[in-house]
Amino acid sequence: MSAQISLNPMATTNAYGLFQTNSAGFTQGDALDDPSVKFFLAGGVLATDAATPIWGGIPIEELIAPTVYPPPAGSGPGSNLGSTVTQAASNAVITGFSVFNQAYGGITTPQSTAPLYSPGMSVNYYRLGSGARIPLLIDPALVSLDGSIITSQVSWDFAANKIIAYDAGVGALKVRILKISTSNNLTVNYDGMTGNANWVSGGVLAVCLI
């Protein structure tokens, strides 16, 4: 028996019944705040021939800025609007990832609650090598990577728009996985039949350094 008070200052929690807010979890495509990389945020225009709209957390292919919009011919401020971007169709052409950060022009409706950016609209993104940390959708089976080295190889499923186990036929995605979050996340569910995209609570996200 001891007269000393036992205290573990690291075992903290919220008291019950205080209407507390839990700040755990991430939002797909919403890059984490970082003063050292915020000025690397880039903007461009989604290609007019893009097959689908785009949203945050999607690998993009950046093309050299055209002299006029819409490319390849037309009139307008041209390269002042930034590069032309489109959804990357293969691992070899991924140049960055789209994000929701400061992208206030996304279209939402009562039936489509996640912001979507149509061909010709402005899209914000971070390039590979920028050092941005972006939450990306990941296959729940890859929770098994917890505790592994951050350079563990993974691939991207271009149909399901998520990180999957490494596939030599697809190639390694050029990201480092810093953290995998399994709860309190917001992910985007895009329905190709209706063209709607909605927020889904509870998906699995990986915070990726690009």
PLM regions with names:
Residues 1-210:
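Surface-exposed, low-hydrophobicity beta-strand/loop segments enriched in small/polar/acidic residues
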